[in-house]
């Protein structure tokens, strides 16, 4: 294959992978069990918890100033899988919390909700020409793009014991949806996931649960990673996808530890 052809193919793969990642991972801002992986503080009840407002959550969610090497913006800047949870259909109801995390919504019946998309910064190609050296530069940049990881971070708040109930529903879903589930929405292709597996969580917050979800992307098997963490009456979710994995390449990755650590620090 000619060098120029390889660059065009690389660009197509990068754009296609990014488009799919945005479709499966973006929502917006809303005003409306074995947790903690056997580590940390456990799931003790929150005393008369009061939900934070969307404005308060907005002050506490990560920003670009908090994370070196990442571009951070509202996840609403990308495409939406659906306009609201009501438009998301999950074949097995008990798997709904997982589907909500993967489609950019809060996993429970939240009072307020905000989200952000954190993407590793990749240097743009400096060359514009068609010489061998210029094409090498462009191709290297495309490899960096395809090898990068994108993470959707959300914060949702709950009144009373809603945050604890949400964590239990996520834990129950991870245990009960091991064989996968199907999610669809009006105007979107049906997403079929074939496997859900519990993973070791970060141990952040008052309780946390991590899991991976495997599905098919244009014939290739793709695995994405997620974690849900409770900080008092606020629940943080993290959903990471490797563009290399979406492009059908084997790529071992997880949720960037610095993102979870930074978000936990902002929640106190």
Identify the role of each PLM range.
Residues 21-25:
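C-terminal motif of bacterial Sec signal peptides marking the signal peptidase cleavage site
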